[in-house]
Structures are given as C-alpha cells and as structure tokens.
Amino acid sequence: MEAGAAGFATSFAVTHRGADGKPIPSRWAAADEIEALCKAVGDSGRGVIGVNGGENLSFADCYELQPKVGAPITYTALLTTSQGTHLAAVEVHKEGLRQGVDVWPQVSCRPLSFSMTMVEPFTLNTSPIFAELMPKSIEERREAFTSHEWRNRVRVGWENKQGLIPRWDSYEIMDAPSSPELVGRRLTDIANETGADPFDLLLELALLEPDLKLRVKAMLANDDADGVAMLLNTEGCTLGLSDAGAHVGQLCDAVLSTDLLGSWVRDKKVLTLENAVHKLTQVQADLFGFTDRGVLRVGAIADIVVFDAETIAPGPVRRVVDFPANGERLTADQPTGMHHLFVNGIEVQRDGKLLQPALDSLPG
C-alpha cells in the first residue's frame, strides 16, 4: 500500500483453478491470513479490498470481515441466478447497510455467458472430475469423454453440488466444423429431436472434432432482465464484472458502460442518465479513494468521455487471432455514439480513431 497500490484483491471462487486443475493457492487461505492481509489495507487509511467469494470466504462473510479490517470491501459479484440466490444476497446486503457495514456488491447490466471450446470448458472445469483433465493431452481427454464411467462420475459430482451445475437449455452451438448445420441451435433442442441426453450429446459432438474444438456459448447468470433492473437500483451496490481482460477468448464485457447507457438508460429507462453516469464515475472513484477523479469541477483531473446519449451502443463483438501461438481474443472496439475521449485534459481519441501524438505524450 505504501508503494501506491489501490488495495488488495483475492479469490476463493470455484472457477479459479491453475493449469494443473488444482485450486489456486488463495482458495486454501486460512481466516487469520485473510484478515491480516485485508487489515493492512485498512491500516493504510485508504484503498479497497476486492473479494471473489467461495467456500472459505463467502459473500455473507464479507459483512463480518469488513468492520474488523477497516477498509471498504467490494465483492464479485451479485448477479441474478435461476435459483434466486441473488434475492437472499440482497437481503443480507440490506441488513449490512442498516448496520453501517461498508460492503459494496458488484452488479452488472451484462448477462454472464462464456463462449468456450471443449478444450477449455471454463464453467465445466469447476467440476473436480472435469478439472482432472486440465493438464491432460487431447488424446487423454478424448478417452475420458468417450468413457461412460467417466461421464457418470461427472453426473454424480453434479448431484452432490460439486462445481457449477450446467444450464443445458442455455447452451448454444457456436462453432462445429464437423456439424455446421447445428451452428446457432440450442443444445436441448437438438437433444429433444434426437432423444439424447444433453450432456452425452455435448460430448459426442465434441468427439466429432479431431481437436475437440466444438465451441458452445453457455449462460451462467444475470439473464433475468427484471432482476438485473432491481440490482442496478439497489442501494450500496457498484458496477463491476466487466472482466477487464480476463477470459479474453471466452467473453468480452468491456462494453458494460456503453450497454448501460444505451440499453438500460435510453431504451429500458431503468436508470436516469445522470444516475448511470454517477455510478460509472464518482461512485467508483470514491469507493477506491481516487481523489480529484470522477467529477467535473475546476482543479479535478480531466478524464472525460463525450458521447451522444441518443446513439451510444456497444457495437459488435468479434473474434480475432493475434496472440502468441495463434491465441484468440474477443474484442468490441466499434461502439457507436462515442465522440471524444480526454485523458488528463488531452484528447486521445476522436470518433473512434486514436490520436497517436497525444498518446505518445503519455497524458495519464
């Protein structure tokens, strides 16, 4: 913190495993270690603590931890779920507000979905049985996918609530070189037509691809529009989970701000323009303790976006292959209605075009 950190963040999420399929080290941290690390932020007198909750530190635990450590906590994330768990989380949060606890759940206007291949099935890898395959070769994975005994082990794990339980009705085929006629179709629709079990069908379609690169889009959470509207208007929540470059080949929610201003302000009228801009700017700056940011006033740092409220929208998401080893990423770099971007008073982008001389001056 003395060196200039904005805070401390850690994860206990079931989705976070290393390349070997084992949980990342932070998921094993003991309560006293967690408290000591977080208290260092509080003792510094500034900064924020970020938590991705899980078994060893739940979202509800954050409301007990925060008064002990003395710094605001923001957790990832409060999203709508088909089981309605977000409703219980909102009640916990409201009770925390009544007690003066400084915890900020992160909410999003974006549905949380993953575009993933069966080589790196991110959400399925939360199953410990799937996770065993993460360090394995394609041939070894094919052998497992073919095995009915292995499939049954996965099912038993799901029955015992191990990992995220797939919502098969949300799975959509995005790329299937050996079955191009299925692209754009729901997995459950194909399963109903063929009399197949959705999980078996998914694996059989993957096995048709020599490299297992069947790509599917799977919905995880936050696809209940009424629930999202409620969360966006819940007191003491902050915008988050744009993912800031994580999972670059599987999702791109960098469009959160333009989607919020276009869909949820202009079209759906869930928020006023003023409230949405406030949530995107000053609420964030104040939470992180960034002084002289997030406001328009004389003497403040002039980081300013000029946009057209009538036309602002995210634009298309596209897949590009420009990473080492032919790595892929999703990008959304063609928004509409974005006219000017100023960093510290210097215009660095105009009508979608970067102004290189200004960038070279490093105004930030």
Regions found by a protein language model. Name each.
Residues 1, 41-42, 57, 63-244:
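Polyanionic/metal-chelating signatures
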Residues 1-65:
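Hydrophobic, small-residue-rich alpha-helical packing segments that form membrane-like cores
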Residues 8-9, 49, 105, 239, ...:
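Hydrophobic residues within beta-strands of alpha/beta enzymes
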Residues 12-14, 19-22, 60-62, 86-89, ...:
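Short acidic, glycine/serine/threonine-rich loops at helix termini
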Residues 13-15, 56, 80-81, 109-110, ...:
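Short, glycine-/Ser/Thr-/acidic-enriched flexible segments
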Residues 21-32, 50-54, 80-84, 248-252, ...:
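Alpha-helix capping and helix-loop boundary segments enriched in small/acidic/polar residues
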Residues 147, 226, 230-237, 254-256, ...:
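C-terminal cap of metal-dependent C-N hydrolases
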Residues 185-193, 198-229, 260-311:
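C-terminal helical cap
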